[in-house]
Amino acid sequence: MVLRTMLVKPHCLEKMIRVIRNLCPDIMVLTEVEGKHNSPSFVNRFIEVLFYYSAYFDSLDAFMEAADPNRLAMEGTLMASAVRNMIAREGGERIMRHVGLDTWRLFLNRVGFEEVEVSEDALYQAKLIVKSYNHAESVSLEMNGKSLTIGWKGTPLHSVSAWRCF
Protein backbone atom coordinates (compact mmCIF):
# COMPACT_ATOMS: atom_id res chain seq x y z
CA MET A 1 0.00 0.00 0.00
CA VAL A 2 1.19 3.53 -0.63
CA LEU A 3 0.36 5.62 2.41
CA ARG A 4 1.66 8.84 0.87
CA THR A 5 -1.26 8.81 -1.58
CA MET A 6 -3.72 8.67 1.32
CA LEU A 7 -2.49 11.77 3.15
CA VAL A 8 -4.89 13.90 1.13
CA LYS A 9 -7.74 11.97 2.83
CA PRO A 10 -6.60 11.64 6.45
CA HIS A 11 -9.85 10.05 7.62
CA CYS A 12 -9.42 7.22 5.06
CA LEU A 13 -5.78 6.77 6.04
CA GLU A 14 -6.62 6.58 9.71
CA LYS A 15 -9.50 4.16 9.09
CA MET A 16 -7.29 1.87 7.01
CA ILE A 17 -4.47 1.90 9.59
CA ARG A 18 -6.98 1.16 12.35
CA VAL A 19 -8.21 -1.86 10.36
CA ILE A 20 -4.61 -3.07 10.13
CA ARG A 21 -4.22 -2.34 13.85
CA ASN A 22 -7.29 -4.47 14.62
CA LEU A 23 -5.71 -7.36 12.70
CA CYS A 24 -2.72 -6.91 15.04
CA PRO A 25 0.02 -8.19 12.73
CA ASP A 26 3.19 -9.50 14.37
CA ILE A 27 5.12 -6.89 12.42
CA MET A 28 4.31 -4.22 9.84
CA VAL A 29 7.14 -2.90 7.67
CA LEU A 30 6.74 0.60 6.30
CA THR A 31 8.92 1.84 3.44
CA GLU A 32 8.24 5.42 2.49
CA VAL A 33 9.85 8.34 0.71
CA GLU A 34 11.88 10.34 3.19
CA GLY A 35 10.82 13.75 1.95
CA LYS A 36 8.98 16.76 3.21
CA HIS A 37 6.99 17.50 0.07
CA ASN A 38 3.69 18.31 1.75
CA SER A 39 4.21 21.98 2.57
CA PRO A 40 1.31 24.28 1.74
CA SER A 41 3.95 26.83 0.68
CA PHE A 42 4.80 26.38 -2.99
CA VAL A 43 8.34 27.76 -2.55
CA ASN A 44 9.17 25.42 0.35
CA ARG A 45 7.68 22.44 -1.47
CA PHE A 46 9.53 23.34 -4.69
CA ILE A 47 12.89 23.56 -2.91
CA GLU A 48 12.37 20.25 -1.07
CA VAL A 49 11.27 18.49 -4.28
CA LEU A 50 14.22 19.99 -6.19
CA PHE A 51 16.80 18.72 -3.69
CA TYR A 52 15.17 15.32 -3.30
CA TYR A 53 14.79 14.56 -7.00
CA SER A 54 18.22 16.02 -7.84
CA ALA A 55 19.72 13.40 -5.54
CA TYR A 56 17.44 10.71 -6.95
CA PHE A 57 18.34 11.50 -10.58
CA ASP A 58 22.02 11.70 -9.62
CA SER A 59 21.80 8.19 -8.16
CA LEU A 60 20.17 6.93 -11.35
CA ASP A 61 23.04 8.44 -13.36
CA ALA A 62 25.51 6.49 -11.26
CA PHE A 63 23.81 3.12 -11.62
CA MET A 64 21.96 3.13 -14.95
CA GLU A 65 22.77 4.09 -18.52
CA ALA A 66 20.82 7.08 -19.83
CA ALA A 67 19.20 4.95 -22.57
CA ASP A 68 18.27 2.04 -20.28
CA PRO A 69 14.58 1.29 -20.97
CA ASN A 70 13.91 0.67 -17.26
CA ARG A 71 15.40 4.04 -16.37
CA LEU A 72 13.43 5.80 -19.12
CA ALA A 73 10.22 4.18 -17.90
CA MET A 74 10.93 5.12 -14.30
CA GLU A 75 11.83 8.71 -15.15
CA GLY A 76 9.06 9.20 -17.70
CA THR A 77 6.27 7.56 -15.78
CA LEU A 78 6.84 7.35 -12.06
CA MET A 79 9.13 10.25 -11.32
CA ALA A 80 7.67 12.71 -13.83
CA SER A 81 4.14 12.22 -12.52
CA ALA A 82 5.32 12.53 -8.90
CA VAL A 83 7.18 15.79 -9.56
CA ARG A 84 4.28 17.16 -11.62
CA ASN A 85 1.85 16.21 -8.85
CA MET A 86 3.88 17.94 -6.11
CA ILE A 87 4.81 21.08 -8.07
CA ALA A 88 1.94 21.79 -10.47
CA ARG A 89 -1.01 20.82 -8.30
CA GLU A 90 -2.49 22.40 -5.20
CA GLY A 91 -5.00 21.40 -2.55
CA GLY A 92 -7.05 18.28 -3.18
CA GLU A 93 -5.61 17.91 -6.69
CA ARG A 94 -2.22 17.10 -5.16
CA ILE A 95 -2.71 13.39 -4.49
CA MET A 96 0.83 12.27 -3.63
CA ARG A 97 2.21 13.90 -0.47
CA HIS A 98 5.53 12.84 0.96
CA VAL A 99 6.21 13.37 4.64
CA GLY A 100 9.20 12.37 6.72
CA LEU A 101 9.62 9.48 9.11
CA ASP A 102 8.93 11.68 12.14
CA THR A 103 5.41 12.39 10.83
CA TRP A 104 4.75 8.66 10.35
CA ARG A 105 6.06 7.98 13.85
CA LEU A 106 3.59 10.42 15.40
CA PHE A 107 0.70 9.08 13.36
CA LEU A 108 1.39 5.37 13.93
CA ASN A 109 1.99 5.86 17.66
CA ARG A 110 -1.31 7.70 17.92
CA VAL A 111 -3.24 4.82 16.33
CA GLY A 112 -1.67 2.07 18.44
CA PHE A 113 1.62 1.00 16.87
CA GLU A 114 5.06 1.07 18.43
CA GLU A 115 8.29 1.23 16.49
CA VAL A 116 10.49 -1.87 16.51
CA GLU A 117 14.21 -1.47 15.96
CA VAL A 118 15.62 -2.58 12.62
CA SER A 119 18.13 -5.25 13.64
CA GLU A 120 21.89 -4.90 13.42
CA ASP A 121 21.84 -8.02 11.21
CA ALA A 122 19.50 -6.34 8.73
CA LEU A 123 21.68 -3.21 8.67
CA TYR A 124 24.81 -5.34 8.18
CA GLN A 125 23.20 -7.23 5.28
CA ALA A 126 22.07 -3.99 3.66
CA LYS A 127 25.62 -2.61 3.90
CA LEU A 128 27.02 -5.79 2.33
CA ILE A 129 24.63 -5.47 -0.60
CA VAL A 130 25.49 -1.80 -1.11
CA LYS A 131 29.24 -2.54 -1.00
CA SER A 132 28.84 -4.93 -3.93
CA TYR A 133 28.00 -2.02 -6.27
CA ASN A 134 30.08 0.75 -7.77
CA HIS A 135 29.52 4.13 -6.10
CA ALA A 136 28.81 2.43 -2.77
CA GLU A 137 30.54 5.33 -1.03
CA SER A 138 27.71 7.63 -2.17
CA VAL A 139 24.99 5.50 -0.58
CA SER A 140 24.22 6.15 3.07
CA LEU A 141 22.55 3.60 5.31
CA GLU A 142 21.96 5.23 8.67
CA MET A 143 19.87 4.45 11.68
CA ASN A 144 17.32 7.14 12.47
CA GLY A 145 16.14 6.15 15.91
CA LYS A 146 14.95 2.57 15.43
CA SER A 147 14.54 2.89 11.66
CA LEU A 148 16.82 2.78 8.64
CA THR A 149 17.25 5.76 6.35
CA ILE A 150 18.65 5.20 2.86
CA GLY A 151 20.25 8.19 1.18
CA TRP A 152 22.39 9.38 -1.68
CA LYS A 153 25.32 11.74 -1.09
CA GLY A 154 23.86 12.94 2.19
CA THR A 155 20.26 13.37 1.01
CA PRO A 156 17.79 10.97 2.68
CA LEU A 157 15.65 9.27 0.02
CA HIS A 158 13.74 6.47 1.76
CA SER A 159 13.08 5.17 5.22
CA VAL A 160 12.37 1.63 6.34
CA SER A 161 10.65 1.17 9.68
CA ALA A 162 9.08 -1.77 11.50
CA TRP A 163 5.99 -1.55 13.72
CA ARG A 164 3.94 -3.76 16.03
CA CYS A 165 0.71 -3.31 17.92
CA PHE A 166 0.81 -2.21 21.53
Which residue stretches match the model-derived regions?
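Domain-level detector for long C-terminal conserved domains
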Residues: M1-F166
